[in-house]
Structures are given as structure tokens and as C-alpha cells.
Amino acid sequence: MKRLFSNVINLTLVLIVGVALSGCTVSNASIGSSSPWSLVDLDTEANPLDVDFVDDKNGFLVGTNRLILETNDGGITWKERNLDIPSEGNFRLISVDFKGQEGWIAGQPGLILHTTDGGKNWTRLDLGNKLPGDPYLITTIDTDIAELATTAGAIYKTTDAGTNWEAIVVDTSGSGGIRELRRTNNGGYISVSSLGNFFSVLRPGEEIWSPHQRASSKRVQSVGEQPNGDLWMLSRGAEIRFNADPDDIDSWSKPIIPIVNGYNYQDLVWDPSKSIWAAGGNGTLLVSNDEGKTWEKDPVGESVPTNFIRILFLDDLNSESPKGFVFGERGNLLRWQG
């Protein structure tokens, strides 16, 4: 009788899981035999959050707990760089961006740094309480010109090296506050609301965010651009979706669930060979070489005891080889070797 009762319970669980995953594409990902990634020793417990390069060799990495590191060998090794940051503040440096010798760093709370000589010297700008929200993303446009996005969904532009900031977005109510924000290739923005219950789009030239509903009842983790400009979405429950209709931003594919391990995905990106990478909790780093149909676990990512929070491939810097990084917690960083 106990065995019969146990079998009934097991069958019921199977049916529940089957119903829950109906309509989803689920893959049992195996571990790959090799990896294009290598682990970088940052010698820090801070979380790396962003990186950019002045040229092929010289670059800066920023992160939590006032983390600023500099490399002179293309990202193989990094050393601490001390800049003019108030000693009493535990700043979260969240964004760094260069265009030639012109560069910016944005941090929370209320910190902006600017350089015009490739990072040799930096000027600290005091934002005070001028802008709603804290700095979240900064983009170098040209000499003395930059765009700054804040945690309130406000977008500002400076044309005089940060002395004055002009509002691009007049009404931020459509953003719902943000948990994540990205700049698109054409100069627009995509944001996910602070609660993950919708996402918003700001197209170039617009002054108001356009909100869009999530694809299911599950909260949105992240939304970004595919190489062709269509969108992708990551939702709770480790679900991946792609735009089903290029002419309809609210049309989504059925969810893809590469593996079921209890951890959500935090980021999705295409590498230079157009393979798709997904990153998430507990060392989750997956790759698909067939447009998301099947997935494979990366062996290096699998061996690192961290939560991966971001994957970044940098634009062409006239580099000898593409530059890519996977950001993990507690000082973990992977570097692309190709």
C-alpha cells in the first residue's frame, strides 16, 4: 500500500511538472568539452559591473565597493586605480564608457567622472540633487558630449563636459522606475520596471517611455536587442523568449527553458560567431549554436562558484581579437579567448 501511495504521488508530480512546462521548449543541457572563456584573477571581493577600453590594450573596469581597475594588456591582468572619490562614501561604480580618449564613469550615489586623455586624468563632477534618481548608464557620444540615464528612467545629455545636463525624457512615469536599462544600437533605450511587471521602450527622438506588458504572468528579468534589432526577454523561471513578429513588439515566441535548476537567467548575448550565451545563478553559463534550439553548459562557468550577472562583448576597437567578459559576484570575471 505504501509503495502504491508513493507511486501515485510520483505520478501526480510528473503530471504537475508536465502541465507547468506545456507549451515550453525544454532542453537537457550537457557540459561542453571545451570553453572559449578563462577565469581572470581580480584579487577582490567586490562585484565587477562594467568594463570598456580606450584602445586594444588599455581599459577600465568598475564595480561595487568603489572598485576601479585598469588593464594595459587587453584585459589579461588588472591593477587597482585610485581616483578622486570621496573616502567616506561606499560608491557603486556601475557604468564606464569610452570613445577614443573621451571617457566617463557613472556611480551611485550621484557620482560622475570624466576624462579627455584616455583615463590618465579624471575630473569628478558633483551632480548634487540636480537629477531624479541615481546614475545608472552613461554613454560617450563625442567630445564633451554624453548621455546619462538614471534609476528613475530619466535621460539627460551634456554638451559641455558635464557642466550642464539637458533633459531628453520629459515624463519618466512610463518607465515605472527601473531594475535594468540598456541603450539600443540606434540610440534608443529599453528598460525593465523595478518590479519586473512590464518593460518600456524609448525610441530615438521620443520624450516619453512607451510601456509594454510582459509576455506571461512571470516577472521580467531582462529585455535586450538581438543582432537584427528584434528583442529578447528573460523571465522568472529561467524562461527565454524572442520576438515572434518583427513588426509587433508585443508578439513573443513560446518560452525556451534550456535547463531547470532553480536559477533565473540574468543576461543574454550573441558572441562574434552568432552563438547565443545565457548567464545566471550558481555558475549558470549556457551556449546555443543553433539559434536557441539546443543548449550546452560551459565547463569553465560550471566550475566557478558564483552568480553570473552580465555578459558583455565590446564593439570593434580595431582589436586584434574580439573582447568579451562575463561578470560574476565576489570578484569573479571570465575573459573571452575565442
Curated annotation (Swiss-Prot):
**Which keywords does this Swiss-Prot/TrEMBL entry list?**
Lipoprotein, Membrane, Palmitate, Photosynthesis, Photosystem II, Signal, Thylakoid
Q: Where in the cell is it found?
A: Cellular thylakoid membrane
Q: Does the keyword Signal apply?
A: yes
Tell me which positions the record assigns to the signal sequence. Answer: 1-23
Q: Which GO biological process annotations does it have?
A: photosynthesis
Identify the GO cellular component terms for this protein.
photosystem II; plasma membrane-derived thylakoid membrane; thylakoid lumen
Pfam families referenced in this protein's UniProt entry, alphabetically: PSII_BNR (PF14870)
Does Transmembrane count among this protein's keywords? no
Q: Which domain of life is it from?
A: Bacteria
N-palmitoyl cysteine lipidation sites on this chain?
A: C24
Q: In this UniProt entry, which residues carry a covalently attached lipid of the kind S-diacylglycerol cysteine?
A: C24
According to Swiss-Prot or TrEMBL, what is its membrane topology? Lipid-anchor
Q: What is its main location?
A: membrane
Query: Which NCBIfam families does this chain map to?
Result: PRK13684.1
Family per record? Belongs to the Ycf48 family.
Purpose? A factor required for optimal assembly of photosystem II (PSII), acting in the early stages of PSII assembly. Also plays a role in replacement of photodamaged D1 (psbA). Assists YidC in synthesis of chlorophyll-binding proteins.
Per the entry's comment, what about the domains? A 7-bladed beta-propeller torus, about 55 by 55 Angstroms, with a depth of about 25 Angstroms and a central pore.
Assembly with partners or alone: Part of early PSII assembly complexes which includes D1 (psbA) and PsbI; not found in mature PSII. Binds to the lumenal side of PSII complexes. Interacts with YidC.
Q: What is this protein called?
A: Photosystem II assembly lipoprotein Ycf48
Which organism is the protein's source? Prochlorococcus marinus (strain NATL2A)
The lineage, from the top, is:
Bacteria, Bacillati, Cyanobacteriota, Cyanophyceae, Synechococcales
Q: Which gene underlies this protein?
A: ycf48
